[in-house]
């Protein structure tokens, strides 16, 4: 589910990414997104690698920071693209308070065991924090209004249904009563004579 969401995000935010040349992996960083995780702001950075190696071949994707350390990232892929090439995806989440310690951020990939590393341009995260897209919870005023209208509509339909049932029942009752008045009264059988015992 997360992978589908990230691929859709990259499709919206990075529509003009160049493809790799002659099967050489091409890493590209998407604009970072600000998330709220456990009450703390985190910066989510996604690296998309076009023309990655197919499954079974070594094609690592990793992030490195300006301080020389490699960062742990979640890597997805490779997945088959509609044009027949393979695509890999890696995501990294960093606390917003620590962004300056990890600048500049670079995404790397290697085509194989003996291949040369391919890297993105360095990404300055602290300047991106003000322009990054935010994914904070927003008030659901419109949703509450829709729920109210839906409840009102359901109540109105219920009242119409109840009125229809009552009218149908009263109409049937009138037919039953009218039918009883039109029928001749039931014939009475003659009762046997009563014998009195005189004492």
UniProtKB/Swiss-Prot annotation:
Protein name: Pre T-cell antigen receptor alpha
Residue positions with a glycan: 67, 117
Organ and tissue specificity: Isoform 1 is expressed at higher levels than isoform 2 in the thymus while only isoform 2 is expressed in polyclonal beta-only cells. Isoform 1 shows a predominant expression in immature thymocytes.
Topology, Extracellular side: 17-146
GO biological process: alpha-beta T cell differentiation; negative regulation of thymocyte apoptotic process; thymocyte apoptotic process
Organism name: Mus musculus (Mouse)
Cysteine-cysteine disulfides: 47-107
Subcellular location: Membrane; Cell membrane
Subunit and interaction comment: Heterodimer with TCRB; disulfide linked. This heterodimer assembles with CD3 proteins into a signaling-competent pre-T-cell receptor complex. Interacts with RHBDD1.
Lineage: Eukaryota, Metazoa, Chordata, Craniata, Vertebrata
Protein purpose: Component of the pre-T-cell receptor complex (composed of PTCRA, TCRB and the CD3 complex) that plays a crucial role in early T-cell development, particularly alpha-beta T cell differentiation. Isoform 1 acts to retain most TCRB intracellularly, while isoform 2 permits higher levels of cell surface TCRB expression and facilitates signaling from the CD3-TCRB complex.
Top-level lineage group: Eukaryota
Cytoplasmic topological domain residue ranges: 168-199
Membrane-topology descriptor: Single-pass type I membrane protein
Main location, first listed in the record: membrane
Signal sequence coordinates: 1-16
Alphabetical list of Gene3D superfamilies matching this protein: Immunoglobulins
Pfam families in the cross-refs: PTCRA (PF15028)
